[in-house]
């Protein structure tokens, strides 16, 4: 019975700007997405029967059709029925290390790993572009999670333009286990409060995306200047999430007050907050200081770093 083990990295947003509405109900976005070393492990085994099974070590993660992992396997079975019939179903085990409901694309990266794993398991020979296109059916973050590294994402987040890779910028990441922020609520609230500023013309949308691509944060990424990147971090959703979630604001302010932190921001729609540091020792020092200041066991703190890849295959049996 064949099987594959894959690594599925989390992502953070270095930049998130909401620039308009879309006919499909989503928003027009300009984002800079970055893979980090915090990752889940996915094991995929072939089954003799045409069934899909999902297991997970985290009690908050469902294992039915509401899980994006299940839907990714179901999508592959639907798109490639002959391979599904020939090779059988799949048994998928998710070993969670990425915090759940954290704005770190944990579900999306797990789904991306399933697409990559089933492609290998069924000998489909799909290209990365084809895998990204399948991922876009599942969710806006899935194409990026397939690709990984450092990219500008536009549209609803599925249109990717690679940037020079950023490696070994150290990060302290914090997330309250019991705290969740609804992504739908965050975007809906932003639309209600700031929708009057949205760009309406498609040429204006394209121009704004191009301006970010040629702007100062991308220049800093090209030059691998961590301090300059940290100074240009931007997330529009902070405007609605921080006033409504005092714990997220408190954590962000505490990170910002640390001398070794060169920049801090909420990732995605939250509630995760990250801080950039110039080296691992400083990141570990910040983690220790924040833990002493907020001894609450509900607060998870991780030291991680930027990486240059998306889904990785560890091996097969």
Swiss-Prot record:
Name the enzyme's class. Answer: transferase
Q: Where does ATP bind?
A: 99-109
Q: Which domain of life is it from?
A: Bacteria
Matching entries from PANTHER family are given as: 4-DIPHOSPHOCYTIDYL-2-C-METHYL-D-ERYTHRITOL KINASE, CHLOROPLASTIC
Q: Which family does it belong to?
A: Belongs to the GHMP kinase family. IspE subfamily.
Per the UniProt record, the source organism is Trichormus variabilis (strain ATCC 29413 / PCC 7937) (Anabaena variabilis)
UniProt cross-references to Pfam families, sorted A to Z: GHMP_kinases_C (PF08544), GHMP_kinases_N (PF00288)
Q: Which GO terms describe its molecular function?
A: 4-(cytidine 5'-diphospho)-2-C-methyl-D-erythritol kinase activity; ATP binding
- For this protein, the Enzyme Commission number is 2.7.1.148
Q: Name one GO biological process term.
A: terpenoid biosynthetic process
Keywords attached to this entry:
ATP-binding, Isoprene biosynthesis, Kinase, Nucleotide-binding, Transferase
Record-given protein name: 4-diphosphocytidyl-2-C-methyl-D-erythritol kinase
Q: What is the lineage of its organism?
A: Bacteria, Bacillati, Cyanobacteriota, Cyanophyceae, Nostocales
InterPro entries in the cross-refs: GHMP_kinase_C_dom, GHMP_kinase_C_sf, GHMP_kinase_N_dom, IspE, Ribosomal_Su5_D2-typ_SF, Ribsml_uS5_D2-typ_fold_subgr
Role summary: Catalyzes the phosphorylation of the position 2 hydroxy group of 4-diphosphocytidyl-2C-methyl-D-erythritol.
Reactions the enzyme catalyzes: 4-CDP-2-C-methyl-D-erythritol + ATP = 4-CDP-2-C-methyl-D-erythritol 2-phosphate + ADP + H(+)
Gene of this entry? ispE
Active site, UniProt feature: 11, 141
HAMAP family in UniProt: IspE
Q: Pathway, according to UniProt?
A: Isoprenoid biosynthesis; isopentenyl diphosphate biosynthesis via DXP pathway; isopentenyl diphosphate from 1-deoxy-D-xylulose 5-phosphate: step 3/6
